[in-house]
């Protein structure tokens, strides 16, 4: 029996690819032992046990970014976490550590190095995080979701997708999707989503132009997320949801989308051939703009800054684009040309390579 330690978490961007790879490992070898390392505060604390995997936790330990009391405590706390993970590796007979970034990842990478256990990394963002930059120094087996990601030994594997997305047959799922959302079969669908946390700029701008979008012959499936600040105007062909737990069905209908440029969103859209306007999150290290660069360069998406995504931009840019059905169809083909549906298989193949070289 082979035992794997999958390390990472914090956000859905780390947890979902981790779970996709865990599922693939378990499918390929039902006897395999898959243990997940995370923190008690991250999303993994809920999602990992719900999926049937054992979760081991270590303290949430952000890398210090300024000289303060936390920075003084960090080296000792980091060493304690590395020792705890090392003990776990020895006690459970871990054959390989597979990391996906997040707070639990870096101590796992250091522990794998000390234990001389094969380490395999997956970096989901085009601009790698601190944990991946550290871990990539310790291993030649580094998979990345985006071409051109600057990490040593990086090889393009795409994003491990949720099974319901990886296996989605959009044509076959369309009748169920139309029924789920109460939408019309004879209109193209514009999917609008800011993710689970929402995106105020996207929500406000689309709501301000809902009438014009529907008058242009489209129907709008608007998933506002977050705190649900918008009220449903009751317009025909405009469906406003606070949250959607069937994103597979939403994507089955999407002929075009407006969204943030998170790694998972981009990779799911590209894998399914959904063209989009991407409005990167305006705060942070600019990783969402980097994420979108490849699909935009391929012609499968349009990039607009958060501050520029205004009703006037919709009038001048989005509405004419949606009116050009040939361009929308071409953008769909170009998005699909950079999409990857077998990211889970590619990461598992990388794990097998690491094991065989050990």
From Swiss-Prot:
One of its GO terms (biological process) is lipid glycosylation. CDD domains: GT28_MurG. The keyword Cell membrane applies. The keyword Cytoplasm does not apply. UDP-N-acetyl-alpha-D-glucosamine binds at residues 11-13, 125, 162, 196, 288. It comes from Leifsonia xyli subsp. xyli (strain CTCB07). Pathway: Cell wall biogenesis; peptidoglycan biosynthesis. Its EC number is 2.4.1.227. GO terms for molecular function: UDP-N-acetyl-D-glucosamine:N-acetylmuramoyl-L-alanyl-D-glutamyl-meso-2,6-diaminopimelyl-D-alanyl-D-alanine-diphosphoundecaprenol 4-beta-N-acetylglucosaminlytransferase activity; undecaprenyldiphospho-muramoylpentapeptide beta-N-acetylglucosaminyltransferase activity. Cell wall formation. Catalyzes the transfer of a GlcNAc subunit on undecaprenyl-pyrophosphoryl-MurNAc-pentapeptide (lipid intermediate I) to form undecaprenyl-pyrophosphoryl-MurNAc-(pentapeptide)GlcNAc (lipid intermediate II). Belongs to the glycosyltransferase 28 family. MurG subfamily. HAMAP family: MurG (MF_00033). One of its GO terms (cellular component) is plasma membrane. Pfam families: Glyco_tran_28_C, Glyco_transf_28. It catalyses: di-trans,octa-cis-undecaprenyl diphospho-N-acetyl-alpha-D-muramoyl-L-alanyl-D-glutamyl-meso-2,6-diaminopimeloyl-D-alanyl-D-alanine + UDP-N-acetyl-alpha-D-glucosamine = di-trans,octa-cis-undecaprenyl diphospho-[N-acetyl-alpha-D-glucosaminyl-(1->4)]-N-acetyl-alpha-D-muramoyl-L-alanyl-D-glutamyl-meso-2,6-diaminopimeloyl-D-alanyl-D-alanine + UDP + H(+). Keywords: Cell cycle, Cell division, Cell membrane, Cell shape, Cell wall biogenesis/degradation, Glycosyltransferase, Membrane, Peptidoglycan synthesis, Transferase. This is UDP-N-acetylglucosamine--N-acetylmuramyl-(pentapeptide) pyrophosphoryl-undecaprenol N-acetylglucosamine transferase. SUPFAM superfamilies: UDP-Glycosyltransferase/glycogen phosphorylase (SSF53756). It is an enzyme of class 2 (transferase). It is found in: Cell membrane. It is a peripheral membrane protein.
């Amino acid at each position: 029996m082979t035992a794997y330690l999958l390390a990472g978490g914090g956000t859905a961007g780390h947890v979902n690819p981790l779970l996709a790879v865990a599922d693939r490992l378990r499918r390929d070898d039902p006897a395999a032992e898959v243990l997940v390392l995370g923190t008690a505060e991250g999303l993994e604390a809920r999602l990992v046990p719900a999926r049937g995997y054992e979760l081991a936790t270590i303290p949430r330990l952000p890398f210090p970014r300024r000289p303060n009391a936390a920075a003084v405590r960090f080296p000792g706390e980091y060493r304690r976490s590395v020792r705890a993970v090392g003990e776990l590796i020895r006690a459970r007979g871990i054959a390989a550590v597979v990391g996906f970034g997040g707070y639990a990842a870096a101590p796992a990478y250091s522990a794998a190095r000390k234990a001389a256990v094969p380490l395999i990394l997956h970096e989901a963002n085009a601009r790698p995080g601190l944990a991946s930059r550290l871990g990539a120094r310790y291993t030649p087996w580094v998979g990345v979701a985006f071409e051109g990601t600057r990490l040593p030994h990086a090889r393009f594997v795409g994003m491990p997708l949720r099974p319901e997305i990886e296996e989605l047959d959009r044509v076959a799922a369309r009748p169920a999707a139309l029924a789920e959302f109460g939408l019309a079969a004879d209109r193209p669908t514009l999917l609008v989503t800011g993710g689970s946390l929402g995106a105020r700029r996207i929500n406000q701008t689309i709501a301000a132009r809902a009438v014009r979008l529907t008058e242009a012959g489209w129907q709008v499936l608007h998933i506002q997320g977050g705190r649900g600040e918008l009220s449903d105007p009751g317009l025909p062909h405009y469906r406003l949801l606070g949250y959607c737990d069937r994103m597979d069905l939403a994507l089955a209908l999407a002929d075009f989308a407006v969204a943030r440029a998170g790694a998972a969103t981009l990779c799911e859209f590209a894998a399914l051939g959904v063209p989009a306007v991407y409005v990167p999150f305006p705060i942070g290290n600019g990783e969402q703009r980097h994420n979108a660069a490849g699909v935009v360069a391929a012609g499968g998406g349009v990039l607009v800054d958060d501050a520029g995504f205004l009703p006037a931009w919709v009038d001048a840019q989005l509405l004419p684009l949606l009116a050009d059905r040939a361009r929308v169809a071409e953008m769909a083909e170009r998005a699909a040309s950079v999409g990857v549906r077998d990211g889970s298989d590619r990461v598992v193949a990388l794990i097998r390579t690491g094991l065989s070289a050990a």
